[in-house]
Amino acid sequence: MAAIQGIEGVISQLQATAMAASGQETHSQSTVSFAGQLHAALDRISDRQTAARVQAEKFTLGEPGIALNDVMADMQKASVSMQMGIQVRNKLVAAYQEVMSMQV
């Protein structure tokens, strides 16, 4: 669900940019900052990893209602979200380096 909200935020920003480029007025003035979105994404990654770790601990302690397949699925989701975060960081660093190497 959080990933869908993040994607919707990116799509709305792209639509607003496209409308601004074509000279149209945007109907919804969203004041979402890039830093805020990045911070929220990092918080979601951290929350997902924490939840997976807690569920793994509960499974290890033998709490009823915790299935191995649920633990493995949550661990995999946490791993994929971490890898996605790393790739986003790599792209941001590459874009920053490219901008810094431009001649003015």
Curated annotation (Swiss-Prot):
Could you confirm whether the keyword Oxidoreductase appears in this record?
Answer: no
Q: What are the protein's UniProt keywords?
A: Bacterial flagellum
Any one cellular component term from GO for this entry? bacterial-type flagellum basal body
Q: Which GO terms describe its biological process?
A: bacterial-type flagellum-dependent cell motility
What domain of life? Bacteria
- Any one GO MF annotation of this record: structural molecule activity
What is its subcellular localisation? Bacterial flagellum basal body
Record-linked Pfam families:
FliE
Report the NCBIfam families cross-referenced here.
fliE
Q: Name the protein family.
A: Belongs to the FliE family.
- What protein does this entry describe? Flagellar hook-basal body complex protein FliE
Q: Which gene encodes it?
A: fliE
